[in-house]
Amino acid sequence: MASPPAPRHRVRAQVNRPLVAAGLLVLLPLVVVAERLHRGAGRRVARWGVAVVAFLCGVRFERRGRGPGPGSPGVVVVPNHSSPMDIPALLWAEPEVRFLAAADLFRVPLLAAAMRALGTVPIDRRDRYRARDQLDALVDRRRAATGSPGDIVVFAEGGIAPAGTRLPFRSGAFSLAIRTGAPVAPVAIRGSDRVLAPRGHLLVRPGVVTVEFLEPIDTGGLTSDDRGVLRDHVRDIVCAATASTS
């Protein structure tokens, strides 16, 4: 659970707010332009921009464990979701991953253009059958283009958990992993809610955000009947790791 911010951090957060807003206004169009000029350049620009803005705000990212990395056969990355800061932290730690995002976010034109440049996939979470079709289409496109389904980040909680809590994991990520035969890579993100609260309104406080890639779980031989057991197992692993302060 996030502890109350120190007074000096509250002041710094107010100073950081316009800095973060300006950073977004500059970075989002840069990502779009870079990706149009050269495939993959948008990701490099995004990672660089995240690192620069984080540094200026007094935020430090740490990466632990072995993530998918270059040449990955494709994994379903399942992190906890405690803060909007989780997304830039993951993008910094593993820039090749692709995110799923609620379709509603794509109604914001500049944000939508940047997300598309990063390969983010809109998902209609109100219709699980349509969401499944969208996921299957994504995997098929990636497999046809690269021979691999790619590394896909799914926030299994379905949204940002209220401060100090964990939401139940939904089954979609695990159904996807079983259908595609991809391993599940649990990820524990710690400190993000102290840096940016769930409803932080760009009030970024100085601090450390740790992204820890845990041991991948093989889904070979599993069927759709096993998705609930797999889901609960991964949730237990992630919850135990996020509770750790080591």
Question: Could you say what each language-model-derived stretch is?
Answer:
Residues 2-10, 132-246:
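Non-catalytic C-terminal accessory region of glycerolipid acyltransferases
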Residues 3-62, 113-118:
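A transmembrane-helix-recognition feature enriched in membrane-embedded lipid enzymes
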Residues 27, 31-32, 36, 71-128:
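Catalytic core of membrane glycerolipid acyltransferases/transacylases, capturing the structured
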Residues 49, 86, 101, 110, ...:
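Hydrophobic alpha-helical segments typical of transmembrane helices
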Residues 55-64, 167, 193-196:
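Short gly/ser/thr-rich secondary-structure transition/capping motifs
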Residues 58-60, 96, 117, 149, ...:
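A generic structural signal for alpha->beta connector loops
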Residues 65-70:
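Glycine-rich helix-loop-beta junction characteristic of Rossmann-like nucleotide cofactor-binding loops
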